[in-house]
């Protein structure tokens, strides 16, 4: 009986343990079966995240998306709006495997917006959580630092930048200014041409005191208030500085004809050069003006292409003093050319009756003379110029062998440098020198060298063989001429219209000449002029063609 009881207990224990084992196996099988039955395509898990980079009108919307299984990335967008309906959409762009963003613009300032991330595969739409952000409020305008663009003795052009309108339309902008000695007494000048745009602004302040120090503040106004920028200091002076070409007339304003002396720096285009001519007494249509500018220093100026013609037909060229640029400027007496000048064209200063001095810069490589500068007394040249030199106010080439430009107003007597070997055409035309002495090494003269000059007496080079055509034509004050021993020929009109009283000829044989060589209009020099010839040569000259017309051939 006892054994049976023990046996019964053991069987119950075995049965219980077997049942538990079977249950565990069944559970494992069941779990395994559930995992293998999980679907391959699941809805993405999307989350709306906080907005960033929020301004008055823009914001960046952020979100995340988690893809499970073999689900493809759906099409995603952000819905947003000022109500929970969120009627506006913006395409979301994936920045990595899980993050998406969208930059939205055109928002209203100080406004709360609702937004959420939304995904769709064309059949099903999944929405994320809804969030909000608030745009920044509008502000007063923001300004950059002011600067001086250009200035004159009584005016200044100020430049400044409106960097931000603050989200509101700017209603007014300009500058405040005051004498530094009384900074609280500020004058306000509003821009009359303001377009309403942000960015670079310029403003002219005129009617300033000469040689005075000012404080200048830029300002801008909107519905949100007025912003006044940091002040800059500016002192007026006698010089004018252009930051941009074409501003000379604007800077001068009503004082255009008030200046007699002026220094100008900066770029000058055709518009500026036309204005400069007007200041010197010559208008755009070549008529006289009330301009009185007589002394101008352009050392720090720079001639640049652009603008309208400076004289009605000719345009400015970079670093070129063009033909007619200063022509007929009746007020001009002295000019220093821009230091970067490379070319001075023919007749750039034509018919400037009071121009006395011209300064040639180091950079000049080509200089041509101007006619009609009756008062021109001297031409100076920078010592650094490698193409020209100035000697006694006369412009010569670099090795001083050729005269380039002889100033018409130079008076008295003049002896040419011994280095000069030739003289070009019309070199002394219309000049005021009364007595000329040539070095004997000059062998050639150009045509019309002394035409219409005021010379009274001249000694020709001893080695000169030919007196060219029109050499002294129109020299109505020429009375005495000395011809060298090697003179062989006197060309037609060489002494035409010259009231000669004495001709000295050192040549043993009479130079070839004809009646036209001494052709005159008026006085008959053949009966009044004395011809002085070498001793023992009187009869030879009296028998020679051309010379025999003279009634007074003598020997000293």
Question: Where in the sequence are the language-model features?
Answer:
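K/E-rich alpha-helical interaction surfaces of small helical-bundle regulatory domains
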Residues: 112, 119, 537-553
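Sec-dependent bacterial lipoprotein signal peptides
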Residues: 1-32
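Short, surface-exposed linear motifs at loops/turns and structural transition points
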Residues: 33-238
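Acidic glycine-/aspartate-rich tracts in secreted/extracellular proteins
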Residues: 67-70, 83-86, 122, 164-167, ...
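Structural signature of tandem-repeat unit edges
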Residues: 240-242, 261-268, 286-319, 330-343, ...
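Consensus positions within tandem repeat domains that build extended binding/scaffold surfaces
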Residues: 323-325, 345-348, 425-427, 446-449, ...
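A structural signal for leucine-rich repeat
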Residues: 277-281, 310-314, 370-372, 495, ...
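Boundary/junction segments of secreted and surface-exposed precursor proteins
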Residues: 143, 238-253
